[in-house]
Amino acid sequence: MTAVSALRPAGPEAVAAYVDGLARRAREVGRILSRAETAAKNRALLAIAAALEESADALIEENRKDLEAGAAKGLDRAQLERLGVDAKRVQTMAVGLREIAALPDPVGEISGLTYRPSGIQVGRMRVPLGVIGIIYESRPNVTADAAGLCLKSGNACILRGGSEAIHSNRAIAACIRRGLEAGGLPADAVQLIETTDRAAVGALLAADEYVDIIVPRGGRSLIERVVAESRIPVIKHLDGICHVYIDDGADLAKARRIAINAKTQRYGVCNAMETLLVAAGIAPAVLPDLAALYRDKGVELRGCPETCRLVPDCVPATEADWDTEYLAPILAVRVVAGLDEAIEHIHRHGSGHTDAIVTEDYGRARRFLREVDSASVMVNASTRFADGFEYGLGAEIGISTDKLHARGPVGLEGLTTQKFIVLGDGHVRI
């Protein structure tokens, strides 16, 4: 560790000075990283992967300290599961870094180069954002994943993980630094905030002189705090209230398959369906069968009055159910008159993450694509496909429901920006 990152300060002023030092160093190193060759970045990524594998036993031992402390603090089973690191998860981190190394490097890519009437050529070059601050909870694998994406996209990064994972994150960060040095890049290209003092988050959010973008990954309370306090632009999504609308022009077999997969393939993820909308004309044919399938999988249905009429064991929905991201085997179900009401419901209650229509009607599909204002809009496909890997982006640092700077899954390209380049041969403006 550097002298700066080895400090574990106490008190708000000391914490602010510590984080300011990390941010200043990140800005310096970011300039070096922005001009690093692709081969050097890939060497470092592969070296980090190897360091993680070589240190697997040590990582698991450090993680054991976090798990013991978490259990003593009363973390529940799901929280401890997210916190855990075993041999398989170490291998997954290493594989992920190798996959990032294999991805095309977006930095330096030139597009749209055209001649202007004056004779100059004008185009755009893709360049790193600069310094990225990443604030996250629980999952230690984010330390490796985020570092890998920032490195490949030419960005320096400052990582602030949850206090419950501090031992795990320190151990992973040590492997990252070792790999960076082995690859011939500055170890401070990736810096971990090692204090668990909550004031460090506020200090990072105020470091707008050095940090270009903030990416929060965690629960709603964390993201709301980041958005409220940050002086720096934020890439984020608050909720994943994803909808599937079964149109009365849907193929019933497709509708059943998509509705079951979108909800039950994995519950605790932001691209799982939370509300099912069904056109009134097809509801009697599809809802009773779907309800039986959900019942077999242990999913609780909370429905509108018409849903409860068609599915007698359905729990009556409250208004709050339409605005809830359950991340659990609970599904809100509403029967709507048709496409107009479905789109209106999504506009009123959706989170702008991912919404899908099941229909064989081309016109309705086109209208749904055009009018639903979400980061991902789908036709005849499960919302679970809203993922950087599935979109061909490789790994992702998160999903953005904002419209600026990035929208949808944020991969390597989303961690870059573009600048104009102009090529001339002694041209002057007349």
Swiss-Prot record:
GO terms for biological process: L-proline biosynthetic process. It holds the Pfam family Aldedh. GO terms for cellular component: cytoplasm. Its EC number is 1.2.1.41. CDD domains: ALDH_F18-19_ProA-GPR. It comes from the Bacteria. Keywords: Amino-acid biosynthesis, Cytoplasm, NADP, Oxidoreductase, Proline biosynthesis. Coiled coil: none annotated. InterPro entries: Ald_DH/histidinol_DH (IPR016161), Ald_DH_C (IPR016163), Ald_DH_N (IPR016162), Aldehyde_DH_dom (IPR015590), G-glutamylP_reductase_CS (IPR020593), Glu-5-SA_DH (IPR012134), GPR_dom (IPR000965). Pathway: Amino-acid biosynthesis; L-proline biosynthesis; L-glutamate 5-semialdehyde from L-glutamate: step 2/2. GO terms for molecular function: glutamate-5-semialdehyde dehydrogenase activity; NADP binding. It is found in: Cytoplasm. Catalyzes the NADPH-dependent reduction of L-glutamate 5-phosphate into L-glutamate 5-semialdehyde and phosphate. The product spontaneously undergoes cyclization to form 1-pyrroline-5-carboxylate. Belongs to the gamma-glutamyl phosphate reductase family. PANTHER family: DELTA-1-PYRROLINE-5-CARBOXYLATE SYNTHASE, GLUTAMATE SEMIALDEHYDE DEHYDROGENASE. This is Gamma-glutamyl phosphate reductase. The lineage of its organism: Bacteria, Pseudomonadati, Pseudomonadota, Gammaproteobacteria, Methylococcales.
